[in-house]
A protein has these predicted regions:
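Domain-terminus/edge residues, biased toward the C-terminal soluble/receptor-binding domains
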Residues: 22-26, 39, 205-206, 220-329
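A subset of signal/propeptide-processing and intrinsically disordered low-complexity segments
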Residues: 13-14, 36, 96
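Active-site-adjacent loops and short helices of periplasmic peptidoglycan-processing enzymes
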Residues: 7, 18, 45-226, 233-239
């Protein structure tokens, strides 16, 4: 197998197998060359730090900067952010955690990101994408008794009430209303779950499975943090989706009687620590889950995924504080 094809493998270098040892000598020579070149530009200490990730990949079989990194990306690492290896990796409570750069998809921190975990209401990001593709935001939806009977009281809806699609979408993404999610799914002209699972297939989210639009524990909705990273990257240009996930509160009105429904975000970190937008999730089996986009520098935004956590907001603060100290922006 050519070296370029090896480095472009969709699996981490540690999973490539015996072939990585065949090319270790070549890769190690490349490490030395890159270190020397970088040394002339940024000093010996910095060049050694810059060469470490590639050296680890070549010798130890550690993951490359991106799971599908090209040889050009590996041999020409971005100047910023620069890792300060004097700052040790954070100790997070979550079973799974991930921070990545939205601009170049570079993974900055990872913990068990390829093991499928239950995602709870993070499912509603996929449901939101399906709603935006299949329903007119200005169309009307009347809540059925079945929709209102869905577990949870978020939104404080009654059967027979009518709302615009955009308002139910707001309730689903701001206050994580299960009633709103089910009502939107029922109103769609095509099966929402079929659309979601086709989208999963199209995006290549190989370890993601969705069986309900809400994410409740009665169905096995699971994904890996790596798949959720790819979902965030794909959905980041859906401004309405992320605008709603960035609202700390909202008021929607029932169409017939103009009855107001006050909504308050479940995302308690909005506007703090640079957090711009995000979605929370919780079930007994999934524990606390969270995805977010946050501002780390004036022109730098990072994505974050937390799964299987007893305290997602503490984990998030730990990771954001670490990212500020561990990288030069």
């Amino acid at each position: 197998m050519p070296l370029k094809k090896l480095l472009q493998s969709p699996r981490p270098a540690s999973n490539v197998g015996e072939e990585v040892f065949f090319y270790a000598g070549t890769a190690l020579g490349t490490v030395v060359f890159v270190a020397l070149v970088l040394g002339t530009q940024m000093g010996l200490a910095q060049s050694r730090a810059a060469a470490l990730p590639l050296q680890a990949a070549a010798i130890l079989g550690a993951p490359l900067p991106r799971e599908s990194a090209s040889i050009e990306a590996v041999l020409t690492p971005p100047l910023y952010p620069q890792r300060d290896f004097g700052v040790v990796e954070p100790n997070v409570l979550a079973g799974t955690a991930l921070i990545f750069n939205l601009a170049d998809e570079r993974i900055l921190f990872e913990k068990d990101i390829h093991t499928p975990k239950k995602i709870a209401s993070l499912t509603k990001i996929l449901t939101g994408l399906a709603v935006l593709e299949n329903l007119n935001l200005n169309s009307k939806v009347t809540l059925t008794p079945e929709a209102v009977a869905t577990f949870g009281q978020a939104g404080n809806f009654d059967a027979g009430e009518t709302f615009l699609v955009r308002d139910l979408l707001t309730a689903m993404l701001v206050q994580s209303s299960n009633d709103a999610a089910q009502a939107l799914a029922d109103a769609a002209p095509q099966n929402i779950l079929d659309f979601i699972n086709k989208l999963i297939l199209d995006l290549g989210l190989e370890k993601t499975s969705i069986a309900t639009v809400t994410g409740l524990d009665d169905a096995d909705n699971h994904a890996t943090a790596f798949d959720l990273m790819r979902l965030i990257l794909y959905s980041s240009d859906q401004r309405e989706l992320w605008r709603l996930m960035g609202l700390p509160q909202a008021t929607i009105y029932e169409v017939k009687n103009q009855t107001p429904h006050e909504l308050f975000s479940t995302n308690k970190l909005l506007g703090k620590f640079g957090v711009i937008a995000g979605k929370t999730g919780f079930t007994t089996e999934a524990k606390e889950t969270y995805v977010a986009i946050f501002q780390i520098a004036p022109d730098q935004r990072l994505g974050l995924v937390i799964l299987d956590s007893p305290d997602r907001f503490t984990d998030t603060q730990t990771l954001i504080n670490w990212a500020n100290r561990a990288y030069q922006w």
